[in-house]
């Protein structure tokens, strides 16, 4: 059976990763978390004390980074070389700085090449900010997932608590609103809905409902 490329885009906290994982599992597809790749670069840059808004410097860093995504029992595992950074890339420090790194053309161009290679055989669900517009513009199914700032902050708050991290709901709302502004206004690959993407607001929907809707859309795209 033909396997397609599915592109899920949307702002921070829209539930893309959780939904993409379950959708991929349901369809027996491979899930590719592009956000984790940008987070890995951000972690490496922070650890080396680099200027997060210096594109050429980050471009040089990219040449030395071996970022790998592998499946694991609890979900996707992320490595830089042989070091696992699955949890390290989810800290508040990385979260608050990843948008600075992601706007650098040198970083995006390198990661886009890697992401396209991962997707070339189809049978993938890829989520991010510019998958349908830049990375996989020919994807057979494109969906733009979103939710209210309040709901997205609440989801992130619950995730942080579950990970045993300190979390401030009001602070998260402010951070997400600022992240939206940065992502939508950046010069390189801004966050926006692809012209042929389906808009899906998940504020009032649970995960199972969203996955069911996306499964229907995927089955329709296969016909």
Swiss-Prot record:
GO terms for molecular function: ATP binding; CMP kinase activity; dCMP kinase activity. It catalyses: CMP + ATP = CDP + ADP; dCMP + ATP = dCDP + ADP. It is found in: Cytoplasm. Its EC number is 2.7.4.25. SUPFAM superfamilies: P-loop containing nucleoside triphosphate hydrolases. ATP binds at residues 10-18. Belongs to the cytidylate kinase family. Type 1 subfamily. HAMAP family: Cytidyl_kinase_type1. PANTHER family: CYTIDYLATE KINASE, CYTIDYLATE KINASE/PANTOATE-BETA-ALANINE LIGASE. This is Cytidylate kinase. It comes from Exiguobacterium sibiricum (strain DSM 17290 / CCUG 55495 / CIP 109462 / JCM 13490 / 255-15). The lineage of its organism: Bacteria, Bacillati, Bacillota, Bacilli, Bacillales.
């Amino acid at each position: 059976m033909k396997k397609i490329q599915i592109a899920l885009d949307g702002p921070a906290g829209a539930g893309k990763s959780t939904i993409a994982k379950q959708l991929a599992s349901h369809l027996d597809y491979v899930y590719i978390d592009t956000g984790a790749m940008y987070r890995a670069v951000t972690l490496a840059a922070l650890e080396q004390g680099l200027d997060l808004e210096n594109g050429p410097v980050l471009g040089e860093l990219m040449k030395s980074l071996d970022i790998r995504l592998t499946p694991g029992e609890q979900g996707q595992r992320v490595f830089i070389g042989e070091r696992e950074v699955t949890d390290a890339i989810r800290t508040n420090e990385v979260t608050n700085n990843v948008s600075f790194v992601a706007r650098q053309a040198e970083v995006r161009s390198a990661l886009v090449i890697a992401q396209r290679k991962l997707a070339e055989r189809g049978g993938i669900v890829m989520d991010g900010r510019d998958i349908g517009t830049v990375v996989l513009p020919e994807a057979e199914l494109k969906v733009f997932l979103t939710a209210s700032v309040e709901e997205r902050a609440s989801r992130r708050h619950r995730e942080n608590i579950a990970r045993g991290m300190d979390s401030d709901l009001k602070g998260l709302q402010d951070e997400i609103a600022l992240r939206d502004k940065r992502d939508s206004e950046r010069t390189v690959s801004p966050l926006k809905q692809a012209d042929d993407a389906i808009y899906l607001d998940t504020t009032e929907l649970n995960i199972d409902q969203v996955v069911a809707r996306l499964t229907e859309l995927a089955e329709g795209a296969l016909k």
